[in-house]
Amino acid sequence: MNKPLRGHHNKANTMEIRQHLSQVDLFKGLTVEQLDAIARIVSEKKYKRGQLIFSDGDEGTGFYLVIKGRVKIYKLSPDGKEQIMHIFGPGQPFAEVPVFEGSRYPANAETMDSCELYFFPKKGFVSLIQENPSLAMNMLASLSQRLKQFSHLIEILSLKEVPGRLASYLLYLSD
């Protein structure tokens, strides 16, 4: 039940999208005009619980922002064991790396609840970044924060005993 609007937004819809964007760290400090330019490239997508958004190895065509619901990012081992890498909730972007790297999605993304997502196509978003250095700086800060979280998680999982690792990992997933 994927329902993209492909960037054709009426004025009221653009205002609603702008309102959501203005509350996200990634877009903080941008002008109304910049937010409207971003809103014009956004596609709104709705997914049911348990629906796959993309698979490990799919072409990285853009990134997403969670508006409602939760999305898990995970890898599957050859024997089918699932390793959750991250859980994203409202206001959190995900799958940004392929936009800049020109690569494929490095993991699977699946909805944990009914979800509303905004999709930012790679080509349109890269053009906006080239025109708006402040957007590029916000994106860099967002990716740096995520790198810091993963670094902390690796430290926790590799340096603690099993009960401590489990407790720390459960706390990490609850954030």
Describe these PLM feature segments.
Residues 20-26, 37, 62-65, 84-87, ...:
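Residue-level recognition of specific faces of alpha-helices
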Residues 27, 45, 76, 97, ...:
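Histidine kinase transmitter module recognition
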Residues 11, 29-32, 36, 64, ...:
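Alpha-helix N-cap/helix-start motif at coil-to-helix transitions, marked by capping-box chemistry
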Residues 2-49, 93, 98-99:
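Cyclic nucleotide-binding regulatory module and flanking cytosolic helices
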Residues 112, 130-175:
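Polybasic "coupling" helices that flank or enter modular domains
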Residues 26, 51-114:
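Cyclic nucleotide-binding regulatory domains
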